[in-house]
């Protein structure tokens, strides 16, 4: 029986980003119609973590919009992590942009176990989707994460117009980093964003299978865009190699009801992992 790891995310600071990533509705440059706020109340975050745990999640990710982990953001994320840990037995993941070693060490002291920082795509293609920071900055952050002893979660977004060569280059870069977890996101179109999706179900299944074969020791997670690219047939991706899903809502888009996902997983004979 295949074990599936469930992860939930909390967008604790939304839409406050000055970067120009063409795939992201949280950039103020594109003016997407999303809910924007500076800080989510700590009590709300704890309650979301409790619900995630109740729904079977072993990981809970604290996400902030913005380029990187400045001092103010660091203090807030540490407070949120400590608040959750005090009341909920769940692994804390942080996703707060580019970060230096000292800041990452502080997160670790606060109880964060995993840091998520995606390369998004290949080094060659990245300048075509973002001009306000470099791919190399992202790669350096991933190296910093590993150097301080945090687990690294690092993946990308597919269907943004990248080529097969870009995907191969991206895989080579990930092999250098050896991440513990690899989230596979499939681009979600928005009328305000300048990109159009170039994926379909067959492409997505092929992508999942390729990453599962290349990274046999990593957790391969179906993340953003799962419902759009696979529809009701998303368990097919688990059968070709994925072993984790994000449950509940994403950063700025709605997800499937967690109880419905759980029902489908159990009905199809999957086991829910009880530790991250």
Swiss-Prot record:
Keyword check for Cell membrane: no
Coiled coil spans: none
Residue numbers binding [4Fe-4S] cluster: 17, 21, 24
Domain of life: Bacteria
GO biological process annotation, one example: biotin biosynthetic process
Keywords: 2Fe-2S, 4Fe-4S, Biotin biosynthesis, Iron, Iron-sulfur, Metal-binding, S-adenosyl-L-methionine, Transferase
Stored InterPro entries: Aldolase_TIM (IPR013785), BATS_dom (IPR010722), Biotin_synth/BioAB (IPR002684), Biotin_synthase (IPR024177), Elp3/MiaA/NifB-like_rSAM (IPR006638), rSAM (IPR007197)
Chain positions recorded as [2Fe-2S] cluster binding sites: 61, 95, 153
Domain Radical SAM core: 1-226
Cofactor binding note: Binds 1 [4Fe-4S] cluster. The cluster is coordinated with 3 cysteines and an exchangeable S-adenosyl-L-methionine. Binds 1 [2Fe-2S] cluster. The cluster is coordinated with 3 cysteines and 1 arginine.
Cofactors, names only: [4Fe-4S] cluster; [2Fe-2S] cluster
Pathway as given in its UniProt record: Cofactor biosynthesis; biotin biosynthesis; biotin from 7,8-diaminononanoate: step 2/2
A GO MF term: biotin synthase activity
Pfam families, per database record: BATS, Radical_SAM
The enzyme's E.C. designation: 2.8.1.6
Enzyme class: transferase
Keyword Repeat appears in the UniProt entry: no
CDD domains to which the protein is assigned, alphabetical: Radical_SAM
Catalysis performed (reactions): (4R,5S)-dethiobiotin + (sulfur carrier)-SH + 2 reduced [2Fe-2S]-[ferredoxin] + 2 S-adenosyl-L-methionine = (sulfur carrier)-H + biotin + 2 5'-deoxyadenosine + 2 L-methionine + 2 oxidized [2Fe-2S]-[ferredoxin]
Entry function: Catalyzes the conversion of dethiobiotin (DTB) to biotin by the insertion of a sulfur atom into dethiobiotin via a radical-based mechanism.
Subunit structure comment from the entry: Homodimer.
Family affiliation: Belongs to the radical SAM superfamily. Biotin synthase family.
Name this protein carries in UniProt: Biotin synthase
Protein source organism: Nautilia profundicola (strain ATCC BAA-1463 / DSM 18972 / AmH)
